[in-house]
């Protein structure tokens, strides 16, 4: 699969050959869904907590005698049926993280890249570098390329000026190649890869 390379200014800078094994797969939604669920589960805080009846600051004494009142039998006012009582089977602090095999995670990344390639939503840029950290200038460059909602993936180290300039642009995410992931690829409309990022992906899945 051949894709043209452009500069940040929108000029032609040659072509790059993309591997069919990485960018040419038929995307499987089930694999993408598994990887996204795994990612979001890892991010979930899990700090939810409700007090059970054993944790309520209230006397544990029996409310009234067992027999002779004509009322329902009760023990402590900590029970869940009473106002201010403990929650029955309430949420507890826990980790929502679950395991996902490495080969499924790797396959998920390939399918996410292939999904973007299939929808013609990949742009390859020769290098992500700016002489000055000017957000206004970078917005103009993105407008030339037709980018309003994109994930930009650079090489192992991002250009400092480019990273600073892109920080305040809404709906634009910038990550080094180490940070590429399925969720961020799918949540943005366009995937922008630097030439160095393409080479790193080819090397990673070789």
Swiss-Prot record:
Protein's GO biological process: translation
InterPro entries, alphabetized: Ribosomal_uL4, Ribosomal_uL4-like, Ribosomal_uL4_dom_sf
Gene3D superfamilies according to UniProt: 3.40.1370.10
Disulfide bonds: none
Complexes and interactors: Part of the 50S ribosomal subunit.
Family indicated by similarity: Belongs to the universal ribosomal protein uL4 family.
Its job: One of the primary rRNA binding proteins, this protein initially binds near the 5'-end of the 23S rRNA. It is important during the early stages of 50S assembly. It makes multiple contacts with different domains of the 23S rRNA in the assembled 50S subunit and ribosome. Forms part of the polypeptide exit tunnel.
Protein name as it appears in the record: Large ribosomal subunit protein uL4
Species: Mesorhizobium japonicum (strain LMG 29417 / CECT 9101 / MAFF 303099) (Mesorhizobium loti (strain MAFF 303099))
Gene: rplD
């Amino acid at each position: 699969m051949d894709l043209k390379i452009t500069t940040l200014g929108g000029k032609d800078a040659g072509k790059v050959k993309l591997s069919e094994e990485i960018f040419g797969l038929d995307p499987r939604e089930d694999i993408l869904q598994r990887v996204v669920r795994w990612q979001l589960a890892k991010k979930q805080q899990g700090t939810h907590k409700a007090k059970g009846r054993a944790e309520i600051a209230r006397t544990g004494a029996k409310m009234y005698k067992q027999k002779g009142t004509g009322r329902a039998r009760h023990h402590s006012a900590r029970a869940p049926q009473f106002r201010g009582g403990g929650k029955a089977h309430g949420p507890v602090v826990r980790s929502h993280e679950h395991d996902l095999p490495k080969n499924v995670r790797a396959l998920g990344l390939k399918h996410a890249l292939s999904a973007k390639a299939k929808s013609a939503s990949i742009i390859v840029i020769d290098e992500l570098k700016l002489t000055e950290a000017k957000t206004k200038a970078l917005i103009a460059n993105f407008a030339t390329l037709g980018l309003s909602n994109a994930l930009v993936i650079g090489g192992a180290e991002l250009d400092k000026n480019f990273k600073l300039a892109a920080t305040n642009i809404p709906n634009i995410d910038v990550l080094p190649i180490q940070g590429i992931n399925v969720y961020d690829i799918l949540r943005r409309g366009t995937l922008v890869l630097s030439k160095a990022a393409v080479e790193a992906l080819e090397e990673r899945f070789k």
